[in-house]
A protein has these predicted regions:
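A mature extracytoplasmic/lumenal domain signature
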Residues: 67-69, 77-79, 121-125, 137, ...
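Short, low-complexity N-terminal intrinsically disordered segments enriched in polar/charged residues
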Residues: 20-65, 69, 164
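Surface-exposed, charged secondary-structure patches
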Residues: 84-132
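Short beta-strand edge/turn micro-motifs at domain boundaries
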Residues: 134-159
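A short gly/proline-enriched turn/hairpin at secondary-structure junctions
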Residues: 72-82, 96-97
């Protein structure tokens, strides 16, 4: 019993080949989109990394560079908000000192809409290589003249960083 004729078989193979090309094209497009999305997320994270690097160097001028002038911070400490301008923060953190400090974020959640971005990430703040406090950082960023700047920062800071 003949299920497929030659023409049916040729059409079936042609359809399968076309479907394969379509799937490969869609896969390549998806990979390109993912690569572009990753590049955009890295561009959003770059000013945060620059600020952390400048904080570790205690360089007030460099701390201010990736910050939107006039912006500010809200640091939650013991259930109370501490507000300060970016200038006050940079002057405080940019003071010379003997202790080696470093802030690290991990698993950042990045959301972008045109020229506005939000980054939510757990963090650890280390002093001389040991965790001093931890919590969650929240960064609001804006893109001005093609450059991402931190517009505001909020964080929770707590000492109970068990397992860190």
């Amino acid at each position: 019993m003949k299920i497929f004729g030659r023409l049916d078989l040729i059409l079936l193979l042609a359809g399968a080949t076309a479907a394969g090309f379509l799937i490969n094209s869609l896969h390549a497009a998806t990979q390109d989109e993912q690569a572009n999305e990753h590049a955009v997320e890295q561009a959003v994270l770059a000013p945060i990394t620059a600020m952390f690097d400048a904080m570790a160097k205690r360089d007030a001028a460099a701390i201010k560079k990736p910050l939107l002038p006039g912006g500010g911070m809200v640091l939650m400490r013991d259930g109370k908000p501490i507000q300060m301008t970016f200038d006050a923060f940079a002057d405080l953190v940019g003071k010379p000192g003997k202790a080696k400090t470093e802030e690290r974020i991990h698993d950042p959640l990045v959301r972008i809409d045109n020229d506005l971005a939000v980054v939510w990430a757990p963090f650890e703040f280390l002093v001389d290589g040991k965790v001093d406090h931890c919590g969650t950082d929240l960064f609001n960023l804006v893109r001005a003249d093609g450059k991402w700047l931190i517009a505001s920062v909020a964080d929770t800071g707590r000492k109970d960083c068990s397992g860190k």
